[in-house]
Amino acid sequence: MNNDKRPLYIPYAGPALLATPLLNKGSAFSGEERSSFNLEGLLPETTETIQEQVERAYQQYKSFESDMDKHIYLRNIQDTNETLYYRLVQNHISEMMPIIYTPTVGAACENFSNIYRRGRGLFISYPNRDRIDDLLNNAANHNVKVIVVTDGERILGLGDQGIGGMGIPIGKLSLYTACGGISPAYTLPIVLDVGTNNPQRLADPMYMGWRHPRITGPDYDAFVEEFIQAVQRRWPDALIQFEDFAQKNAMPLLERYKDRICCFNDDIQGTAAVTVGSLLAACKAAGTKLSDQRITFLGAGSAGCGIAEAIIAQMVSEGISDEKARSQVYMVDRWGLLQEGMPNLLDFQQRLVQKFDNTKKWENEGNGFSLLDVMHNAKPTILIGVSGAPGLFSEEVIKEMHKHCKRPIVFPLSNPTSRVEATPNDIIRWTNGEALVATGSPFEPVVHEGRSYPIAQCNNSYIFPGIGLGVLAVNAKRVTDEMLMESSRALATCSPLAINGNGALLPPLEEIHLVSKKIAFAVAKKAIEQGVALEITDEALNDAIDQAFWQPVYRRYKRTAF
């Protein structure tokens, strides 16, 4: 924690101190500090508390009308005074999370070069591939423990944004701190600039990235490998989160590195963990098990297949065979249901094809099986959307599902809001209020026939901050599948619906600190059990989590000589 009563000794003074976001207090510098650090005359006379600063900042925030302007304003505070930024965000977490992350961050990525004001993190470009060690040494933060890295090729549902993708690592790490208590001094956002194939970015005179078609194949793999090795040399214990890599790279990179370094892919594993946790809560509330369900996915990319594999693992842990579990999962992409013998499937898709014996008696029109065909024949109880294609959960599809399932569970998870497969309002209306809905982006509660239905945001921010906190608390050397499974189970125990039989599927964001600590404990405990972290007692583990949990409060400063 940073509520340490001991003073912090600072070598900076004057404008240099005010220009250091991690240390700047602005108007909250005391009279003694202003004198010691040559700040007199550089600040207004009044010394304020952080709460007074928050009140002014919130008034200014409310004066902006558009979400983009609010995003830019918050980023400006972050780049000026990080302690104030995180206190403001924590005080208004439900209101501001959609601004600092999805859905607003999508537009911020698309307009990154146009709204750019100040650098944050590292931009590691392919032309500098022989100097990555030097670039890492230039990072503003020296004791880095968590890195979020992207190559900008698959930003949310928006595709290739080049270096504009940097908005995602910045936003994700903001949530590591705001939700998971990881000190911003330990975080580093990175974009690997390997070019872009987005013609709009290449033609934009404002675009600030490397103007070159994307590097691919062996050259790309060698570049990523050199980056990983350089990080290992500089920060050998750092957790690396891969973020928004394209499908063709996301799973291969995860498979290549997950047993070599401490890393995970949030799009694949984090999304899977929060989805499984939400489904476990829904099943508990309904008095059933996940292994009793039939599950259809729309979207068979790395994210969808990652969720499916996590669901299958949970089903198997409940006592059914792997083969039986796979027979209850139906993957649908643009070509229809994935079936054995289909050409051009990727390795991770091959493991999820339906066998002919399971579908030979199905009814359909034309070749293959559409989503509607699957609804009619498989009679799923759960429908999950990770397609990035808006509107594909049509009224006909949802009503067909509802025919065979009184309480359908429908998760349209695609981000941002413009890409959602169906709106909660439509799903609730089409099922006469009987569907249980969770989404990837935030939605207001739905009012149907006089009743209000809370819509859970099945957001990775419920999971990855706790994973990071747990890894840091015990200095875990790997992030294993079992650790991720424990994060899902811990999240499910926090569900108001599962606990009380009513309320929201997931806890309110105002309780995210408690959720993150609970997940951190479960993740760290499993890491110890699996031998990827040193063994400590439960009491010592709780203490380690509390000690690692950073709070946005100002510490006293004392000046030290250079």
Curated annotation (Swiss-Prot):
PANTHER family: MALIC ENZYME-RELATED (PTHR23406), NAD-DEPENDENT MALIC ENZYME, MITOCHONDRIAL (PTHR23406:SF34). The keyword Transcription does not apply. Pfam families: malic, Malic_M. SMART domains: malic, Malic_M. SUPFAM superfamilies: Aminoacid dehydrogenase-like, N-terminal domain, NAD(P)-binding Rossmann-fold domains. It catalyses: (S)-malate + NAD(+) = pyruvate + CO2 + NADH; oxaloacetate + H(+) = pyruvate + CO2. Homotetramer. Its EC number is 1.1.1.38. CDD domains: NAD_bind_1_malic_enz. Belongs to the malic enzymes family. It comes from the Bacteria. One of its GO terms (molecular function) is NAD binding. The record marks 267 as: Important for activity. InterPro entries: Aminoacid_DH-like_N_sf, Malic_enzyme_CS, Malic_N_dom, Malic_N_dom_sf, Malic_NAD-bd, Malic_OxRdtase, NAD(P)-bd_dom_sf, NAD_malic_enz_proteobac. A divalent metal cation binds at residues 243-244, 267. Transmembrane segments: none annotated. One of its GO terms (cellular component) is cytosol. It comes from Vibrio campbellii (strain ATCC BAA-1116). This is NAD-dependent malic enzyme. Keywords: Metal-binding, NAD, Oxidoreductase. The active site is at 101 (proton donor), 172 (proton acceptor).
